[in-house]
Amino acid sequence: MRLQFLAPLALVFLSVRAAEPAADLEHGRVLFLQSCALCHAAGPGTTAGQGPTLIGVVGRTAATSPNFSYTKALQDSRLVWDAATLDRYIANPTIAVPGTTMVIAVPVEKDRQDIIAYLSTMKSQPGGDPAPAPTISPEAANDPRDWRHASPGTMHRVVVDQLPAPFATVSTRNNSAVVPRPADARLAVPAGFSVQLFAEGLTGPRLLRIAPNGDLFIAETRSNRIRVLRPAVDGASASANELFADGLDRPFGITFYPAGNNPQWVYVANNNSIVRFPYQAGDLKARAAAEVVVPKLSETTNGHSTRDIAFSLDGRRMFIAVGSGSNFAEGLPKKSADEVARWDAEHGLGAAWDFEFHRANILTTDPEGRQPLKVFATGIRNPVGLAVNPITGDLWTSTNERDGLGDDLVPDYVTRVKERAFYGWPWYYMGKFEEPRHAGFRPDLAGKATVPDVPLQAHSAALGIVFYPASSGAGVFPAEFHGDLFVALHGSWNRASRTGYKVVRARLKNGIPTGEYQDFVTGFVVDARNVWGRPVGVAVARDGSLLVSEDGNGTIWRVTPAAKR
């Protein structure tokens, strides 16, 4: 599913340098599988991901591979991927081409040399890239999960026992093209609600968090910074817009500590570390440099790069979500039964190893980071968003599941996360179903994977989540919404019929999920090929209104009961 952004595409346009005598092709192939194959095809054993193919990239003009929506920055760069240019790009993409959505770098020169040498052996075949999925088809028109059928109030339930077999449909690369928001674009919300533009002109706003005083903290991940907006008195717009901190490393998760009206710290989850800034209520700019709390989360930083953080209700534990480096741990070396048993005993049931060590799981430590990182739960491919239920104390996550098995596999999900539970990845999915690409690899895990609470339509790309509290205020929702969970769906790329691109409401009853979810905000899709918005963050403002960020055109939207604008 969605790679770390991916949105930010992991190694989207790998540079290529002429192979040198010292280059190690096999090492380059392994590095490619570990770092790039999640998004890019480049030869045998790799399939098309959400990024452009890298077959034939050597000598290619930037932003010319068909069937992919490139950033304007890369289109305007007019670069040709010769050895020197491409090596410079992969070393630091955002410096080489400011505005590119590729943020993952390969800092080690020898690694770049080996990857480039491997890529230089990959030549385009007659026929070029595969054609994109058809823009209109009878199948799409009749598919109840297609974007055309999204409508506020529509209920959904994914029944695990009715899932199709793997490869029942062909795995399709069907990227959306992000276009400027049309003048007549209108978001749709349920009857009795209203939605208005809250802020615009932001740079790829991702996760949202509300400070106790009501300020809105925004992760502008691609720009490596945190921004703060202060809502106006009526809550309908921002009266202040300030840069809180920059110079970060792909910041995503934000939270405040300790709980209450006067937190002392703002915690930020970087790609591979946790830092915090001293904070007093009302600060619009960081009052001091960041303090490192956890210096390293994992040994690898490729693949999914979003990291979220949350604290337990008692404030004693800090939870950290770390996504996988790959789609399904392709290329993972095998271990003997004894080696597997020892590994599981030390790192948790079903935990992957090698380049996936400390990946695809939720880690925990104390708020000061003094205790060694421990695995809280395993087998969660890309746990993007975290939230603690303010009533029950349960930890929840949103998860992007694996790609390549067909239009309706594997369901994404939101779920309560149980300590020491195993959620399947990479060996199984949705409890009992074995991953066919690892058939026979871990028979000992049969029947041991936990089934998630709320499966979502496959390839929806669930990102930010927030519980709706029983609050008061000018924008407060009706009581029936209190305790439910809102989920931002960034939208599909690996499905013939487009799905996601909306905000949904997961229903809970007395803190227990019903398994159903409901369309709540729709209207981000223009047509079968184009979208203007991709929802990422959701947050409940101090006045009770719901705020939604989208990183396609850099806007934030505000949902209120219709009579409470």
Positions of PLM-derived features:
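Sequence/structural segment immediately N-terminal to covalent heme-attachment motifs in c-type
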Residues: 22-44, 54-55, 199
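Detector for the c-type heme attachment site
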Residues: 39-46, 59-60, 91, 120
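C-terminal capping alpha-helices of c-type cytochrome domains
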Residues: 80-129, 546, 551-552, 561
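Beta-propeller domain segments
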Residues: 136-190, 263, 306, 324-374, ...
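Surface loop/turn motifs at the tips and blade-to-blade linkers of beta-strand repeat domains
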Residues: 197-202, 243-249, 293-301, 375-379, ...
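Asp-box/WD-like beta-propeller blade repeats and closely related beta-sheet repeat scaffolds
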Residues: 239-241, 245-257, 264, 270-314, ...
